[in-house]
Amino acid sequence: MANHVPASFLTRANALFRKNLTYQKRNIWSNVRLIVIPFYLCVLLVGIQVLFDTQVNNSADNRCGCRCIHKNGDGKCERKSCGLQYSSLTQASFCAFPNPPPLLPLLQIPRPETRLVDPARSSCRRTGSCPVTILVTGNNHTLGETLSRNLLSTSFAVNSSDHFLRNLAYNVLGTISEADYTNYLDPGIHSDLPIFQIRPYCTPTTNLSFSFRQPPITFHKEVRCVQGLNLWRNNSVEVNDEIFKGYRQGNHEEIINEVAAAYDLLDTDRNKFNVTIWYNSSYKGNFKVQDRRVKYVRVPRSVNMVSNAYLRFLRGPGTKMLFDFVKEMPKQESMLRVDIASVIGPIFLTWVIVLLFPVILNSLVYEKQQHLRIIMKMHGLGDGPYWMITYAYFLAISTLYIICLMIFGSAIGLKFFRFNDYSIQFIFYFLCINLQISIAFLVSSAFSKVETASVAAYLYVFGSGLLGGFLFQFMLEGLSFPRGWIFVMELYPGFSLYRGLYEFSQYALKRQLNGSDGMKWKYFSDSAMDEVFYIIIIEWFLALIAAYYMDRVSSSAKDPFLFLKNLIKKSPSPQRHSLQRLGSSVSVEMEKLDVVEERAKVEQLMLESSTSHAIVCDKLKKVYPGRDGNPPKMAVGGLSIAVPPGECFGMLGPNGAGKTSFINMMTGLVKPTSGTALVESLDICQDMDKVYTSMGVCPQHDLLWETLTGREHLLFYGRLKNLKGSDLNQAIEESLKSVNLSREGVADKPAGKYSGGMKRRLSVAISLIGSPKVVYMDEPSTGLDPASRRSLWTAIKGAKKHTAIILTTHSMEEAEFLCDRLGIFVDGRLQCVGNPKELKARYGGSYVLTMTTSSEHEKDVEMLIQDVSPNAKKIYHIAGTQKFEIPKDEVRIAELFQAVEKAKGNFRVFAWGLADTTLEDVFIKVARTAQASNVFS
């Protein structure tokens, strides 16, 4: 039993969810292949890693240098000796160091132009005289000030160059030279830059030069004095804030304010020494592709300084902890190792994640191209349930996709995944796929063909990765590129995704190279991830809102900027709008009386706002704009008809007459150029979404899901009509029987295996399920055999008791059997309207006599007809067969039979027949007359 209460939001959402669940179950292997794509891509990364390692191992520059020390008789080397003495500078770092040389314990100090200074004293940067700043904090301010004064030595002595390293233990020396990758020579010594002596104050005598030997090289160095400035801060938060703001990206002015060291003395007192030391880990390297080894970082001198300060506090100024040198740990011979996943991770994973975008976009555009979206909407599925269920499906698939990516990547040992916090990664990927889905919904409104959408989507995929890797990353790492423009570039979704992946790769490299923690929540605000998160979240919501708006606009064929126009001028009400059209319309063509009467009836119904008719069309017009220099094409010209419940109104017309355009306007596929129509008192120009809840449609072409069965189609559309439980099952069984799809398990076969006729019958069953109040059928019996066609007609006739049906057809037999009234449509205009008998009586006031004789008796036949009816017309003649149209008012049937029997005595008549005017004759006559009048007009 039909439930005429419109289905609720949840009911429609449930219908779509269950349909999609069944559909995806039938396409399970396609979904599995999509989800396991990350596995193959991760394996590809491993393959690239193996290939890279093979190439690296074959290169002499990536291992310690060797020399052949013994050759055999054939000249082939039998024994090699490897070591520093045989290596180039490139090869040296890969050599074994069983006994590393001692290294000078220098303090890393900032360059003069980057040292932390008060803005009022920044002129020292130009002269190179800025002091070196050391920050100190702790729980005990007095103790902190005391230890600060003890950090730096007030004397400097170099007794002998032969004991230079030992003498260094009594002084604090530093260098502005960044440490290099070498672990046997300190760049602070073998570079041309001077060594700096850090003192509380400087005098001219504190600058000197000396020579010392570090076999096999003798160095000549200049020692310059630089003032050390110890500053107290209230707590570690202030220290952290000052250090962070000292980085170029930590302040809006992009000014570097660097400190040499910082100490938190915590709860240190005379009985306990507890200190935290800050140092600049960025000196370890910039982690670019070409710089994978760890740089030397001068932390030991910072430790020695605070230790000596505490000893002086306890034992007096003469106490010192001697610091002769530092040495690297002995190392074995090594080779270059690069983690490819971390190096190419950003560009590669950008492609991997964005690869879902074409899948989502193609799916959305396919439903629009095949009109599956609109046919669901025509049967009552609103935009809200469609969006909720479709979005949830894409989100579920995308979430499984990224989970598999993280699992597979971690399982095969990719450090990109293993070295970063999984929760941060998941949330980042989750936000990215939500933004990606929202953008796919937004962009889908701009495409009508899958091929075009697919090309654009893959351009976006590859463009995002390539531009990110070769443009965005270059600007990101460039110190001179404004940070504000980086933010602007990140507004492009592909670059915000790339930036997040870039941060993950950098933190993974840092952990690999210097043992840091990787990306953790505690470092979240120190990276650019918080900025990326904010951008993605805001764009996600904005894209979602814009996509929903554009979807509503495109589905209703409205101007995207209609909301702006509505703010300026309020739209008139539907009823007043139709009255205005009535008053302003002028017709210059002569119309038949029946058409004029139908128009007058429509005007009266519109004025009275009557609800007695389910469908009322008022001067409905559709004009398609001209293209390629052609004039505009009028498909429907001011059609006015009214159809009450229980009536089947048939539309006859030649191809191109405008029948399908009329159906498309009534079902919301196209927007009327002018005029309107009321369906159950709802205006199709204003309330189409409400109209859909009481409407059924059988389109000209079958819009079905190939993998769903006939029963599953009816289950889906029945639920949209608010049928439930036993009522739903009963309605489905009755529908299947009425269209002859219930036998031999046909109902449970996929629609893709149906013949054309079976698909047509299923489309009719879909349009009638749930007893809709209005049904549109566009050539419903096309492609059916006679038996199936007759069965289908019976089903349609039985369904029209409380339903208004508008039907288009080329079958006169179908029109006579089903239609209570007919309208003949030619060149976009209604030429006549009435029931089949009235039309035949009105346009068919003649008999058609057909007679076949030999060719020599054709004249005799003509004379016979002229004797019977002087006004008879010959309408057909070929090879002895002639047809004549005889006016009914000039002859009686009995007289005609007598005349033929008499003629048989004079010449041989092979065959003859007399027929009344058929509906086809009426149609041809009206169509020819209308087309002829259009030609002459």
Swiss-Prot record:
Positions of ATP binding: G653, P654, N655, G656, A657, G658, K659, T660
Domain ABC transporter: 618-852
InterPro entries linked to this entry: AAA+_ATPase, ABC2_TM, ABC_transporter-like_ATP-bd, ABC_transporter-like_CS, ABCA, P-loop_NTPase
Record's keyword annotation contains Ligase: no
A GO CC term attached to the entry: membrane
SS bond list: none
Gene Ontology molecular function: ABC-type transporter activity; ATP binding; ATP hydrolysis activity
Ranges that cross the membrane: 34-54, 340-360, 394-414, 423-443, 455-475, 478-498, 528-548
PROSITE patterns linked: ABC_TRANSPORTER_1, ABC_TRANSPORTER_2
Annotated SUPFAM superfamilies: P-loop containing nucleoside triphosphate hydrolases (SSF52540)
Membrane topology value: Multi-pass membrane protein
Principal subcellular localisation of the protein: membrane
One Pfam family matching this protein: ABC_tran
Signal peptide limits: none
Keywords from the UniProt entry: ATP-binding, Membrane, Nucleotide-binding, Transmembrane, Transmembrane helix, Transport
Organism superkingdom: Eukaryota
Subcellular location: Membrane
Family: Belongs to the ABC transporter superfamily. ABCA family. CPR flippase (TC 3.A.1.211) subfamily.
UniProt-recorded name of the protein: ABC transporter A family member 4
Taxonomic source organism: Arabidopsis thaliana
Gene name as annotated: ABCA4
